[in-house]
Amino acid sequence: MSPRSVASLSTLLICVHASLVAAHDFWLQPSEYWISQEALTPMTLQVGHGPFRQRSPIPARRITRFQAVAPGGTVVDLHEQLRLGQAAEDGNFRFTAAGAYVLVLQTDDRAQAHLPSIRFNDYLKVEGLTPALEQRERLNQMDRDGSERYSRCAKSLVQVGPAGTGPQGQVNKPVGLPLEIVPEANPYGLAKSASLPVRVIYAGRPLPGALVKLTDLDNDASPFEVHLTDRDGRAVFTMPSAGSWLLNVIWTKALPRSEETDFETVFSSLSFGFPPDHAFLQTSAYGRED
């Protein structure tokens, strides 16, 4: 996507009614992304950006998967650690082995959204949902109200121990979500890359033409960077080195007329972040030098 296209899209993202856009961004937010072994770490489920950001009110019955993929590839069920709606957290986790963990959360697809035609069309344009736009245009339905059923998927990268300690390979592997963002460079790796290439996987295959947004969660009124995936489902972002960050993507497909809604949509995110003093933690916060 050209700089001019990105600028135009960013303007559109800001101009569209904020509550419409913010309502669809959902992610896992650990209190810290870099933790020591055995540290009990709280996390929350977040939704929205800027002034519309809040704890997600999603009920526990809708969460079908909450796991951690450990550095060695073992899958740990974290369902019992959910504490939705508590005053300060929605759950917690504790890991013993050093390395990079992938937190994984998935919901069912029983939620529905019904919007007037103008708002639905704006939403489709902002999120780059071309299958829905093309169908509505082809069937002369741009003036009709729109509806979708939807599910949410979220991943979060957690590093246990200093940078580079323990296995890191799970960061770059899909975890079997219906829609997911797979980083092809490790944000937590010792060999720091200037770019962050990612691949979007939908229904087990690379997804071309998807709009992927990178947001600085400390300055989250609008995305920091936006790209469309290429024919291989890839997009390349600037690699962050400080703060908390969110990548998110949305995709949809048309449903048969016999269904209650017009489309089935999946919202997917990947969150990651760095300690306040990244360089210091790499050498001394865990009591040794590498």
Question: What is the meaning of each model-derived region?
Answer:
Residues 108-116, 253-258:
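Short acidic/polar inter-strand loop motif in beta-rich domains
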